[in-house]
């Protein structure tokens, strides 16, 4: 089923990091999303993470998290066709396409950091493609 959000292929068990500072608004099973976490960042923005294998110990409703904290692990729960992270941005209680959201730019990778990123990206993509055909 087509949905708003973006899917990131990754091996089962890959850590998932909070996209920003906030408070866990929901952590549990959520229908077709399977194991699901929603973080409230402020009065307008939330992020959601679905199909998780599990939650990091201590993650539950009301817990404060910081950007970059591990919150859970990639899985294949709910209505999922393989291990991946389904990621959503919710603005004013409406799902929006994360790819079209205008946010301040992040760090630009250069040199060795960029090389490491490209290598890891290719490994994750290759692993996911192998899982599709097993």
Functional labels for PLM-detected ranges:
Residues 123-134:
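C-terminal recognition in membrane/secretory proteostasis and scaffolding
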């Amino acid at each position: 089923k087509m949905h708003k959000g973006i899917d990131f292929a990754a091996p089962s068990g890959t850590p998932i990091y909070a996209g920003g500072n906030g408070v866990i608004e929901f952590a549990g099973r959520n229908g077709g999303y399977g194991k699901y976490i929603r973080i409230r960042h402020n009065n307008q923005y939330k992020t959601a993470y679905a199909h998780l294998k599990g939650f990091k110990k201590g993650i539950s409703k009301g817990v404060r998290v910081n950007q970059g904290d591990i919150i859970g692990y990639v899985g294949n729960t709910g209505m999922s066709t393989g291990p991946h992270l389904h990621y959503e941005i919710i603005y004013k209680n409406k799902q929006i396409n994360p790819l079209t959201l205008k946010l301040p730019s992040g760090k630009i990778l250069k040199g060795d950091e960029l090389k490491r990123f490209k290598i890891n990206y290719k490994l994750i993509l290759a692993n996911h493609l192998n899982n599709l055909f097993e």
